[in-house]
Amino acid sequence: MRKIKILGLIVLSGLFISALMISGEVPANAADGKIVIGMVDAISGPFKASGDRFQLGAKYAVDEINAKGGLLGKQVTLVVEDSSFKPDVAVRKATKLILEDKADVLIGCLGSHVFLAMMKAAEKYKVVAVNPNSEAASITGSEFNPYVFRTTPTTGQRTAATIAYFAKYSKFKKFYILCQDASLGRDAGEGFKQNLKKIPGSQLVGEDYHPVALKDFAPYISKVIASGAEVILTTNFGPDLGNLIKTEGQLGCKAVTGGGYLFDPVIMQDVKEAGLGHLVIHHSLIDLGNPIQKKFVKDFQEKNKDLDKVFYSPVFGVNDYYYGMQWMFDAIKRAGSTDSAKLIQAWEGASYNMPWGKVTMRACDHQIITPYKAALIVKDNEFFSFPYTGKPVVIPEEEITVPPSQTGNARCK
């Protein structure tokens, strides 16, 4: 009888611990000497090229910290799942990473609409989800949950930086918004409209939102030309940006495109001279005049010398995941644990020195506060034989930071 009671207690204890692990109240891998990072991203479909490189940036960060002895005395394991760039798939894969792979922390993913779905799984199971990529303002704004930390700026910051550049470095007055019909594009459209008010005499001469993964941009670019727009404002990325730029060139559109992710070397290798003179805006633009970033590029390329230099160059997305994970590792070290409650407490309000300057994780919305960089696409550059970014200029954080009261986040006053 006593053996039966003891056996029953063991079974009940096991069930209790399992329940705690699933709820996120204790680190799932505390007992087996490893820390699991679960990554969800687009590694198939039309945006596979981006997801593949993001994965490489994450792996580089993990390999680097493991080579230094690991994190909290444990080796870090990266488990990657494919979102297929679909919200429902991302939720399913995030849930699998938490329940089956016992992920201590989640990271991802391309597509704000995809991450908005994925972050609900993080909240349900009380697991911190780090976002080094998706920029829709609603992620840390109206849809905020306390398990999300974003190490990339919002559409509010991106659009403010874009308009700040045009206000300071150009005389353009006629603007046309052309974005994806998705969370990122819609949030960006609102941000562009709000920030255009800062340019005296500016005109919004057109506004369109196109389907994601669009093949034919000719009807949209024809409308841009007819409007007399001097600038196309967009947050397009991947094929949607490449096709937009190529169509501009084919139809003889003279407008400057700004706000998108044209520092993607895969896209620039494709569009070539059609990209000349367009504007790149990003907080972590690599500047080889910066010794820290120059060493990062050199070390990264040396380790990955057998891979295609253009495709796997650490200048787009790769560095965002790398730097985002470095900051996450720092927060875990200061928390002394991957326990979600402790990690949240340690990361809220924390500052970190990035190669481009000091950044802060704003406590109320878990949003990075950072300066921005802007650069034009030029023919002769330090990176590639095809056109790429020239020397960047810095846009101070005080010019682009969205005030807490304007984020749509109920915690921010």
For each feature predicted by the language model, list its residue ranges.
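Short, low-complexity disordered leader/linker segments with a strong preference
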Residues: 1-36, 67, 407-413
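Immediate post-signal peptide segment of exported/extracytoplasmic ligand-binding proteins
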Residues: 26-39, 68-75, 167-173
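Signal peptide-proximal N-terminal region
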Residues: 31-34, 56-78, 197-200
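Solvent-exposed, acidic/polar segments of extracytosolic/periplasmic ligand-binding ectodomains
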Residues: 33-35, 351-413
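Extracytoplasmic "Venus flytrap"
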Residues: 34, 38-59, 81-88, 110-111, ...
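Beta-alpha junction/loop-to-helix N-cap segments that form part of ligand/metal-binding clefts
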Residues: 49-56, 70-141, 151, 210-217, ...
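Extracytoplasmic ligand/sensor domains, especially the bilobed periplasmic-binding protein
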Residues: 88, 102-207, 254-280
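Extracellular/periplasmic periplasmic-binding protein-like sensory domains
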Residues: 245-322, 329-338, 387-413
